[in-house]
């Protein structure tokens, strides 16, 4: 990554997805490996003054709860992901879990909630968007 950033003037790196990046260390657990990868990416972003976006899976238990809206605690295999990140954005599609209505009472059909679960320098919050499942596209909610 260092070489690519310096020779190609890259300002953004995307990792799809974090749990697939291997970091082998004797006697370490998978959680420790993912933690080390998250910390290494954070340090690399600072060192090279670039943005790194790392996609991560959620724990499978999210869909088995009464409230399937994801939280920071649902990040798979590491609490270090939350610690190392400046911003954590979670995507929640209630329709995927068989939920008919959003928290505000509007129809959950073709909707997605973007959850800003952590936002160093930007704060936290949520925004509801439209979601066109057939083409995997987010749109203004009003255009659905």
PLM regions: where:
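C-terminal regions of RecA-like/P-loop NTPase motor modules
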Residues: 1-13, 27, 39-49, 60-144
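DNA transaction DNA-binding modules
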Residues: 11, 20-21
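Walker B catalytic acidic pair
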Residues: 17
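Catalytic P-loop NTPase motifs of RecA-like helicase/translocase cores
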Residues: 21-22, 61
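Conserved ATPase-coupling elements of RecA-like P-loop NTPase cores
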Residues: 22-29
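…and closely analogous acidic/polar surface helices at protein-protein or active-site interfaces
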Residues: 34-38
